[in-house]
Each structure stands twice: as C-alpha cells, then as structure tokens.
Amino acid sequence: MNQEVMNLFNPQAPAQTFDSIRISIASPEKILSWSYGEIKKPETINYRTFKPERDGLFCARIFGPIKDYECLCGKYKRMKYKGIICEKCGVEVTLSRVRRERMGHIELAAPVAHIWFLKSLPSRIGTLLDMTLKDIERVLYFENYIVTEPGLTSLKEHQLLSEEEYMIAVDEFGEDQFTALIGAEAIYELLASMELEKIAADLRVDLAETTSDLKQKKLMKRLKIVENFLESGNRPEWMIMKIVPVIPPDLRPLVPLDGGRFATSDLNDLYRRVINRNNRLKRLIELRAPGIIIRNEKRMLQEAVDALFDNGRRGRVITGANKRPLKSLSDMLKGKQGRFRQNLLGKRVDYSGRSVIVTGPELKLHQCGLPKKMALELFKPFIYARLDAKGYSSTVKQAKKLVEKERPEVWDILDEVIREHPVLLNRAPTLHRLGIQAFEPTLIEGKAIQLHPLVCTAFNADFDGDQMAVHVPLSLEAQLEARVLMMSTNNILHPANGAPIIVPSQDMVLGLYYLSIVAEKEPGEGMIFADMGELQHALENKVVTLHTKIKGRFKTVDAEGNPVSKIYDTTPGRMIMGELLPKNVNVPFDICNQEMTKKNISKMIDHVYRHCGQKETVIFCDRIMQLGFAHACRAGISFGKDDMVIPESKAKIVAETEALTTEYEQQYNDGLITQGEKYNKVVDAWGKATDKITEEMMARLKAVEFDPVTGRQKQMNSVYMMSHSGARGSVNQMRQLGGMRGLMAKPSGEIIETPIISNFKEGLTVNEYFNSTHGARKGLADTALKTANSGYLTRRLVDVAQDAIISEVDCGAEIGLTMQPIVDAGQIVASIGQRVLGRTALDPILHPVTGEVIVEAGRMVEEKDVEIIEKAGIQSIRIRSALTCETRNGVCAKCYGRDLARGTPVNQGEAVGVIAAQSIGEPGTQLTMRTFHLGGTAQVVDSSYLEASYEGTVKLRNRNVVRNSDGNLVVMGRNMAVLILDATGKERAVHRVTYGSRLFVDEGDTVKRGQRIAEWDPYTRPIMTEVEGYVEFEDLVDGLSVSETADESTGITKRVVIDWRSTPRGSDLKPAMVIKDKAGKILKLSKGGDARFLLSVESILSVEPGAHVKAGDVIARLPMESAKTKDITGGLPRVAELFEARRPKDHAIIAEIDGTVRFGRDYKNKRRIIIEPNDDTIEPVEYLIPKGKPFHLQDGDVIEKGEYILDGNPAPHDILAIKGVEALASYLVNEIQEVYRLQGVLINDKHIEVIVRQMLQKVEITESGDTGYIPGDHVDRIELEEINERLIEEGKKPGSGNPVLLGITKASLQTPSFISAASFQETTRVLTEAAVAGKMDTLQGLKENVIVGRLIPAGTGGMTNQIRRIATARDELIIDERRKTSGSAEANAMLVDMTNNAAE
C-alpha cells in the first residue's frame, strides 16, 4: 500500500537498469504490440477548437490526454479519476506525458518494402534474393512481373516478365500452371518462402567448390546475410512492411503561431501523405477499380512510405510548401544536427553563463574572477536554500523577491555559497582536456570574467575579445571531481608531452629575461653580498644595477633540511629570482643563474615540479609570474622603428647573388644546364643570400655596444630581447622586417624565382608587393580550410580510440617495441632518453661497459635513469608498448607507462585513447593556424651534403665505390651506408649515401665533428658507368625515343629521352647505353650482367656515341622535381593519410623476398621485374613497374626483403605484410612525428601507438579451421586467439589470420558497438546492418554510455560501475541465502526494499 502512495507523489518509476541494448527488425506483431490504436484519418487538429481530431494523427484516444488528468470532453478532471477511460470521448485520464511515449500504427492496404533494407548499400533484400537492385525495383514499382512458382512450365524462378510477356505466358500455359506476381507482394512471397538453413548449407558447399575470387566474394556476402538472419531470429519477410508505426505526437509537435498559422514537424506532412494514399487505395480496392489505377496507387503508397523513412534516398526529394526538402525519420538521426550528435552526445547545460575574459594578474592560480551579477544568477537555488535556512525567508517566493532586490544579506550569503564551491571554465574550441578547468570563484565588480594569465596557454586564450563559459558543478560528487581532478593547480603538465603547461609567456618571459641579463662595466662590479637585505639596500641606493656582475651568497638546505649557503658569481637580478626558488637540496641556484629564456623557464618549472611536488610548484609559478610582470613594466622594453637594423652588407650580398643568377641565366643560354636546373640553382642562390643577410642582421642586433662617455654597456636591442627570450617574434619575422623578405611561394606551392629583396622597413616595390600577396592570401585561405580539416581529424581519432581505457595493471605481455634515437640528416632529433622516459622496460637495461642493470625489467624509466642511459651511450632499448599490450578490453598500465599529465604511473580507468586523440588532434589545429605567420615565405628543404655528427672512425657498409676521371671516390652502391664508430667500436651514427655521391672519406679514416663526408647534387640523379670503355647507344632513335630539344631562348640543343611508347613504332624499344671494349664486345659488370644502362623518360644524355668513359663517369642524368616548400599543408593531409592508412599516390614498391633482380619481358607501358629468391623453396616474385618512372636497379643487383624497388612513400599495408607489426609501428610513429616536428610540436610516441593499436585490432581470417568464420572475415585479434586456445583444448582445428591495418574511419565503423558507430558516420548503413544481424551493444566504450545516459566506464565512473556490480552480486547471494532459510514472501519484500533504495 505505502508503495502506491509513494508512487502518487513520485510518478517517475525507477529507471530500469540494463547492461546491453539489442537492435533488430520489428515484426508486424511487435509494431502492433507497441501501438495504442490505428490512425485512420490524415487530420491533425480541429483548427477552430484546437482539439485533436478523433482517429487523426494527434488523436487523444490513442495517444493520451492533452492536459494532465483531464479527458478531452471535460467529463473527468483531477487526480481521483486516474486510470478511468471516459465513455464519451474514449480518452484515458492520466498524465499528458504519455503523449511522448505512446505510439500508433497505420494498417497498409498493400505491403511496401522498407527503403533501408532495399536501398542502403549493399541492398539486403537484393543480396538475400540474389537479384540486382534494378530488377527488384522493377518489380516493386510495378514495371515487371516476377515468377514466384514456375510449376511445370519452361519459366524459371525469379524470372522477370514484362506485361506483354506475362500475357503471352498466361495464354501459353494457362493462368493456374504458374504464379507470377508484381509489386511488394511478390517480393514478400519470395522472402517468406525462403528456407534459410537450406540456402546456408548450399552456399557453404558452393564456397568450398568455387575457385574464382569474384564468385567467392559474392557467395560470402550472401552467406553472411543468411547467417545473420538465422542467428538473430529475424525473418526476411519483415523487411517488407504491412504495418507502419507512428511515432508519439509530442515528438512531432504542431505548435500554433500567432496569426492563426501553425508550425508543424515535417513528419506530420509525411505521415499525412501515407494515410491519404493508403485510404485512397483502400477505397479503390473496395470499388474494384481497374488494375492499372490500383497499381499506380500502390506505387504512390510505396513512394510515400519511402519518403517517410528516408526522403530523397530514391527518386525526387519530396518538398514542403516552401520548396524545402521535408525532414524524414532518417534525417532526424543523421549528421551534425541529427539526434545522435546534437542531443545525445552534446547537450546544452543548465547553470551556465558566458562572458568576455580579461586578465587577472593578482589572482592565485586556483582562482578566477566571477562577476557578481553572474554569480548571483548561477548560484540562485543555493542562495534560496541558504536564505531559508538562515530564516531570512520562509517561502521560495520571498527568497526570490530578496534576490531580485539585491538586498545586502543576499550578497553575504552569496559569499558563503561560493566559498570553496569550484566552477568550471571552458573556452571553445575545447581541443584537449585542458580546455575545461575548475577554479574557485572570487567575486568581482564589472561584467567580465577574470582569468589567471598562466592558464592561458592551456585554454589557448588571449584577451583580444575571447569569451569563456562558466558551468556550476551541482552534486557533491561533481564538486569533488572538479576539485580533485580538474582544478587548474592539478593540471600543471601537458598531457601530450609531459612538459609544464603553466609556463610564463610574453610579458612575463620578457621581464624574467631582463632580470637575468649580465652586463659589462656596470657600477659596483665585483662587489660581494652576504644576503638579500644587503643587496636590496645596494639596489635602492643605485650602488649596483640589476645586471652588475657580483658575488652573492645563496641560502638553501641540504639533504637533512639544515640551512646551508654557497657563494655564486651572479647578478642582483638573478639573486632576486633565486630568492623565489623553493628551498630544496635538489633545486640548486644554477637553474636560475643563467639567461632565462622561455625554454629555460620551462625547464626550471619542470625541475621544481619533479623535486618539490605540486604545491611548491604552484606557489613558485605564481611568484615568478608576479616578478615577471613587475620587471617587464619597470624595464620599459619597447619596439621602435630603429630597433630593426638593416645590415650594411645587404646591398653587397644582393649584388653578388644577382651576379650569380645572371651567370646561371648565361649557362642556361649556353645550354649547359636545363630550365629546371637553372630554376633550382637560382632559388638556391637566393635562399643562401637570405640566410646570409639574416645572419648579418642577427649579428648586428646581438652586438654589445659601450657608451663612449660613461663606458657602460648600452642596453641590448629591445626587439632582439623579445625574440631571443622567446616572448614574441621569431628570427623569421625579424628577417622580414629588417633583412629581406626572401623567396615567396605561389599558391600552388611552387617558389617564385624572383625574391622580394626589400624588407618591410624599407618598403616593397609594386611588383614585390604583388608577389608577396600570393603567399599571404594562401596563408589565410589555408587557415580557414585546415581548421575544419583538423577538427574532423580529431573527431575521427577520438572515435577510433574512445574505448582504449586502462583496464588492468599488468597484462604480462612478453613482446614490445625497440626504441632507438631518431637521426635526421646527421642530427639527433629525438634522443633515446626522450623516447624511453616514462615507459616500462621489457628486458633489463644493462650498462654496455660495466654490464650492471640500470633499469630492471618491468620498471618504469625515470629521469635519473635517462641520465645514466644517455651517458652510457646505449643505442637501442626494448620497451613495453600499448601496441603490443594483450589486455582484452583496453590497455594495461604497465604497457602504457607514465601518465604524462601527472608524472606518475597511469591509474586504472584513465581514458588513454581519448587523451591520445586529443594530443594528436589539438596541435593539428594549432599548426594550421600557424601557417600564415610566415606569410607564405618559402623555406627550401634540400640538403646537398653530409657532415659528421660525431668524432670517430669511418666504416662503409656494403662498400661499392670507384674513382672517376677527376680522381674522386664515387658511390656506386644502391644501399651503401657510412657508419661512424666511436673509440669502443660502437655505432654512433649511420648515414645512407645516395648513388652518385662524391665521398671525401674512405674505410678506416678518422673524422672530426662537422667534417664533410660526402656531397651530391640534390637536383639531378646521375646514371654512371662502372666500367671503362666506349659508349654505344641502343634504341636511341631520333624522333622516337630521343629528341634534340633546342631551348627556345638559347637555341642550344640537348638530347633528352622522350616517351617512346606514345607512337606505335616505338612500342618495342628499350632505350639504353652500352659500354663496349675496343673490339666492340659488350663489357661485363662486377655482378655478372652486361654493361647496359636502361634510360627512363626525361633522362638527359651527357655523352656522345663512341665517347671513351672511365668508371664513375656520368653518362646521363635525370632531373629531379623542383623543390616544393615544406609547409604543414603537406602536414595535415599527410597525418590524415597515415592514420587513414591510404595508399600514397605513387607509392613505393617493396621487395617481398631476398634475392637477385632480373628483368623480364616488358609490356606496352609496364616493365616487368622478377626477383629470383636466394632460397629455392620460394617461388620467384614478379613486379610490374610503370615505364618511365625513375628506376635505379640494374639486372643482377642483389636485393634484401623490405628494400625499395621503386622509390616513393611506401604503403603502410605493404610494410605490415612484409616487415611485420613492429616495423609498421615505427614507420607510422616516425612519419607522423616528422610532420609535427617540422612545426616544433612535441607529442609523446605513446599517443600515436595507442591510435595505431586501435587500427591493428582486426585480423583477416585466411584458414577458418573449426572457428565457424568464413575466410575474409575481419575478427578481433584477441578474440581469435581465445577461440583458438579453446579449439586446441578440444582437439579441433584452429583458424589463422593475417593482421590487417584499418584506417581510423574504417576502424571506428567496425567497432563492436553499433551505437558508437551510428553516432560517428553513415548512420543509416550502420543501423541497417546492426538490425539485420540483431546486434547486441554491451555498452563497453565511452560513447555508447554517454548516449544512453550512464556514467562512462572510465575514471570515477569505472569505479562506480565496479562497486555497483559487486553490490548486486552480493545482494543476490544474500537473497538466495534468505530464500533457502525463510519463505519466499520475506525475500521478495527484501528485494522490493533493495530496489527502492537503489532507485533513490
């Protein structure tokens, strides 16, 4: 009884708890069971009375009352009649809320096909019936008959007959000898009569017998759908609808506007169409109208239902009165404005406000300034409650009045309410988790929110009019999480790379840099100070300045905490900064006794954080911020026109370069170089000139000058200080202001030959200005485009990685990755220490000399270990990685390593996938926004020489060199490398040297650091001879394969190989040069082949026939592409290409086996290359290579597995197939890092590894064994391993598969959760597929749980769910015990109690 009374006042039934959601096709019985009545009329509401029409689309009898507890005619009102059905109007007396839940239905006079199963590719109905979509549509839309039962006639089942053919057949065989139907009835009959088990068995037999790939694919597709129907219990005929469900009226409302018009949901129009046509069809059937009219009406009904479910999927889009397409049920779900993305994944929040932000330098790091007016509005309910509790008001109404009048007691209460109640601040776009942080509000006058300057970097905020939103966490748990996890003081490190993110910037950096400058000959130089008091005294009396060289005593503590002091050579400015350092034995004065550039400040904060903990760091940051602002203000550093110095030597350098370009022009006119070579040389020369001028300018700015009168050092150049300290501006921008603007790029990415010689200070000429607009505009256009692209990339990344959560501590994996330092052009760009820091060692890391263990296996590498590793010069370390982690759902903590944002091992429940996605996506947007800062200034990227990066001894791997006629050593090997070994014989550096490079060192030579090892021409690729002899041409026929091109401007001719395949006569030619001896015999090469050198298109011949050549001489050369500028434009699309695992446009061809290269018979425009394996058990492998592609292998070359046969970017799938997972991982990580490194963005490798892990989750079944899978199925890797283990135990045959690499979009759509996939992309397709298969969503990932409105299974939600599971299990145990001991009544009562407690 009491339960009933409780329910009266709390009508909301406890929300049902569920663990999974299943989707399937609704049967007609199911639709009827949902429905509360049939809708017979198309009317909506009566336009005079505004009451719903009976049996219409808004009927109150079917859907429920319009007002709470009141029937339509008004006979029954109030609660006491709850549940009564009025006998006059037939309306149940209940809550009007049921109009949101109750559905209706329409009985169709003729069956219609469900458009999703018909048109969503691949068509389910088509695949099931094994008919083409066109044929099915012909039957559905009443063009052709289809034979459903051929009987004993010569007709075949599923045969289509036109009207005439049908008539002829009827005449010939008689009407009852066979059955042929038309329209959806026909398809319904066919589907209903399918015997799925038998079809599945037949298909399996066919599959085993067929040999053709195409047939196999087709059969497999069909088998899959048949199996789906069998497993899910769906019936095929349910794809044809006889009853259409009608959604509740409050979900498709009709709202009266003023002026007697109505705003209606499009669905009402679509339903109205269906009802009208259905009723007309019923009437026509009753009237026994002619067949053709009925058919037409049936077709129109089919079209109306199609439009209702998915408008525009077939035929014309149905538009409303204003020519706007009507929004169908599918459109309600799809896209950014659809149900999933608009309302389920993102919602508008109560208790929030937004305002402009201004800087609040006097705030502490954990505070923000909240305008009083805003706080009053946001915290209203809390204020009402407190007013009531304090007795200022007795009702809510009174409290409201008090607040509206803004009485003084209200302000006091607001202070109380706000104290220790954190609020969340968010700045859009929220690109990573630091875009929302919690602060404690302090009340301020005014209307703008005050933000602490140090958190600006995290929010990417500036104060030029940015706005931020404030949200109030209401529940105690929410406040707790905000305080413990989201407080700005808890987010000191950047989750992407573990570097501090609370770093002073701009003014603060400038102030601190100014403080730390040392100047010569300042007053008081050489004085010694005992403590800060003395120093302050001296400063105030101007005995010393901030920059004087002095000796000072710095006080700190030793390891036991006893005060100690030490004397340093320093300056008063640095002493003031040192005063702020926390007193700790590990924080020496040295870290601030240096020039405080932004980098050094960041290092200092990091150091303090590592050794003194979070609290000290926060206090320290606040104090150096105050100090920085104060001194930036006092220093008065400003930017003046004359601070930009134009170097005197500029004119000279420009004149020299102009002379050079004239010379190149002349060489080109004389025919010594080609147009392309000239262009490259000119661009190169101007590039060098720009660099030279920049160097001179920087030298002038850096120069220290002394005042002739006082003898004191003049103040440093202000602009140089700004740039050098890292506060603002780069060398690049200074070059454009004071040096020369340099080369510009066209919008296409090509560099314009004529540079901009002027700088902005001198001003540009008209022509220069025009050229400069190219680059500038491209920058702006790029920015707009790429912001969108980058956001989309982030979205795809988040989607693919959202269910990577730390779910256990250790998975016990015994495999991992090998880390090595990354070397680029001889420079170490990422040291091994940086790469292994915060990762778990897989094997013990041993010292190479002493052999002692530096890090045990399974321990995380810390900063102190990194120092030892770097000193020891270890070159490769095996570590655990998320990529090789063997956890079933998610990743384990050991494989992941350190949580970068906390600096400690990662916690269970951390959503590492989302963090990885944000870390990769966030700089994407930054990068895109950064292009235009360079204003499109070109940066040429081509090096033409190699310098030693270490001292040591040279060793040549795969040595193959000759001396050419000039006496230089020339590289003849294709895969030769120069190694530099240190004194202990360890490899310090490995450099690949390209074919045709000139070597300046040989095996065993010693080199100094910076010494040139080799050089080459970056713009052409030479073809050289290995043997001495006489040149003879083969198939070099003038006009066919070779043309004498006279340069237009010079008239000088050169001979170029042209595309010989373009004419029929030239199709069999193989242009080549042969080297013969005096007797005319072809010479042999060292590898045994003939000395024949095949030439590709565009090769320029460097020798005449009959010429005498020596080994190493160039006989032809191939011009390379002109240098394109590197810009993130190549970057973002490149990152997307890698993550989407697309095959690059002209991708490299990789050798699959070790062996020898042989040339096979050529095709018309392909060249056949055969690799004969070294191992006789393997078959030779053939490759077809487009002719005319620059191709560098010769017949007889030895090639190793994984080497490139044709250069280019390799396709990631090939790397996976040939070299395996680890090689793929390191390729992807390095390529993606390369793009970000170019922009100076640091991202930890582990983030990329997490994403790659998600891309590699599936294997493609090759041998199905007894697994029940079909070859070609994509199955979860770990799932297959588990099934195989079980099969082996049972003594059955396990299945096998190859790992497949899926792009991130594909991987997201293949997640086991259909809810997550549907909310990502291609909603209709995903839902159709899921419904046919009767898929179950177990709600494992984050997205599905957000959509169904539960706590996500990560972080605190993971714990809560775990506790809930344990509690339920225990309750069940207790109840079972009780059941055994006492009667069932008591146990049931207990159950009821428990459910109620849970609900509350």
Swiss-Prot record:
Enzyme class: transferase
Function: DNA-dependent RNA polymerase catalyzes the transcription of DNA into RNA using the four ribonucleoside triphosphates as substrates.
Keywords for the protein's UniProt record, in alphabetical order: DNA-directed RNA polymerase, Magnesium, Metal-binding, Nucleotidyltransferase, Transcription, Transferase, Zinc
Reaction(s) the record says it catalyses: RNA(n) + a ribonucleoside 5'-triphosphate = RNA(n+1) + diphosphate
Note on cofactor: Binds 1 Mg(2+) ion per subunit.
Family in the record: Belongs to the RNA polymerase beta' chain family.
Cofactors named for this entry: Mg(2+); Zn(2+)
High-level lineage: Bacteria, Pseudomonadati, Pseudomonadota, Alphaproteobacteria, Hyphomicrobiales
Entries under InterPro entries matching the protein: DNA-dir_RpoC_beta_prime (IPR045867), DNA-dir_RpoC_beta_prime_bact (IPR012754), RNA_pol_asu (IPR000722), RNA_pol_N (IPR006592), RNA_pol_Rpb1_1 (IPR007080), RNA_pol_Rpb1_3 (IPR007066), RNA_pol_Rpb1_3_sf (IPR042102), RNA_pol_Rpb1_4 (IPR007083)
Top-level division of the source organism's lineage: Bacteria
UniProt-recorded name of the protein: DNA-directed RNA polymerase subunit beta'
